[in-house]
């Protein structure tokens, strides 16, 4: 007896060896995919009729700050320095642990409802984000943000907390939580500190999550301080490797791209955040052409302002067509790979495609909508027409988190109301 059978679906496997099924069945047992075919002889406790829908791998959001849902729309359309110094940083200074839990739970709710099944997060009070992930049923790679600012005492305290978090939560939530070390960026951490963090990560067998060359200001500051850019500094201290998740990577030279390729660094492309903050356009087309593993992330809600990865998918596809002057750049299936296969590789999860033996993280997208009719090409529709709100069912680790638009793992109204109250009180404290 299987646990779940999804039948009558268009099965978008994202498996290059298998292809898609126009009318197929997916069987789930003990948290894994056990069968994919036109039909099955199995019976199951739960049968989902997905007629008129697409079943596909869940999406991976490879860079966000979940608790920043509390800052959604708080300070928009400002210069970066003013945005940070006068609004975001003063508000963050007032954060309490319970705020981070409520903001993270709201983020998890939003992701469940829009098709994201795994995410990578870097922030503060990360025990609270981990608790939210545990409660929500999602999969996550979590890191405590380390911002040393050339202050040895602060750096030691941050690293101690980062190490504690990594060891406390690795493999928690039945293996759904992985932990990473999160040095903020090369322009906020000294090279000595970055080296220490890398050594600790190696000792713990943990990955590294870091911002790299998000802005031209970072590029200029690094050249002034070190005579080299962030990528070359990280390369020179032996920081890079397949265990590194580098967010943004906007201001890259061709030489930087070659280093990322050689070291098998995973890149998280955050096009909407980069556009909203006018940070620039990452050379994603070049990176993909060179074989760099490029994934997609939303960044935090303060600079997006939502966690809908379908928006990120469409934006990435369009942005790099216009920026390269090439309408064939980043075709639909390639962008879907960035959000699924590539994301799973970056996060080290056995997900990202529908294949027997893989973990059962998947979503059902309802195609019976006016804006999805008619449908001549499913991948194209998912990229250029679909929205997060078209996701009707979300499954992680073989557990149904949302069924036919109804979230099963939390009280949606309560989560929204508590987050709204926490955000209002937080901003009031910041402005007092």
From Swiss-Prot:
The organism's place on the tree of life at top rank: Archaea
Pfam families for the chain: Amidohydro_1 (PF01979)
Keyword Electron transport: no
E.C. numbers: 3.5.4.41, 3.5.4.31, 3.5.4.4, 3.5.4.28
Reactions mediated catalytically: 5'-deoxyadenosine + H2O + H(+) = 5'-deoxyinosine + NH4(+); S-adenosyl-L-homocysteine + H2O + H(+) = S-inosyl-L-homocysteine + NH4(+); S-methyl-5'-thioadenosine + H2O + H(+) = S-methyl-5'-thioinosine + NH4(+); adenosine + H2O + H(+) = inosine + NH4(+)
Cofactor stoichiometry and binding remark: Binds 1 zinc ion per subunit.
GO molecular function: 5'-deoxyadenosine deaminase activity; 5'-methylthioadenosine deaminase activity; adenosine deaminase activity; metal ion binding; S-adenosylhomocysteine deaminase activity
Pathway where it operates: Amino-acid biosynthesis; S-adenosyl-L-methionine biosynthesis
Biological process annotations from GO: S-adenosylmethionine biosynthetic process
Residues that bind Zn(2+): 63, 65, 211, 299
UniProt KW 4Fe-4S keyword: no
Cysteine-cysteine disulfides: none
Chain residues that bind substrate: 92, 184, 214, 299
Family: Belongs to the metallo-dependent hydrolases superfamily. MTA/SAH deaminase family.
PANTHER family recorded: AMIDOHYDROLASE-RELATED DOMAIN-CONTAINING PROTEIN, AMINOHYDROLASE SSNA-RELATED
The protein's role, per its UniProt record: Catalyzes the deamination of three SAM-derived enzymatic products, namely 5'-deoxyadenosine, S-adenosyl-L-homocysteine, and 5'-methylthioadenosine, to produce the inosine analogs. Can also deaminate adenosine. The preferred substrate for this enzyme is 5'-deoxyadenosine, but all these substrates are efficiently deaminated. Likely functions in a S-adenosyl-L-methionine (SAM) recycling pathway from S-adenosyl-L-homocysteine (SAH) produced from SAM-dependent methylation reactions.
Note: SAH is a product of SAM methyltransferases and is known to be a feedback inhibitor of these enzymes. As a result of this inhibition, organisms have evolved efficient enzymes to metabolize SAH via different pathways. The pathway found in methanogens differs from the canonical pathway, it uses the deamination of S-adenosyl-L-homocysteine to form S-inosyl-L-homocysteine for the regeneration of SAM from S-adenosyl-L-homocysteine. 5'-deoxyadenosine is a radical SAM enzyme reaction product which strongly inhibits radical SAM enzymes.
Name this protein carries in UniProt: 5'-deoxyadenosine deaminase
Organism of origin: Methanosarcina acetivorans (strain ATCC 35395 / DSM 2834 / JCM 12185 / C2A)
Lineage per the UniProt record: Archaea, Methanobacteriati, Methanobacteriota, Stenosarchaea group, Methanomicrobia
Name of the gene encoding the protein in the UniProt record: dadD
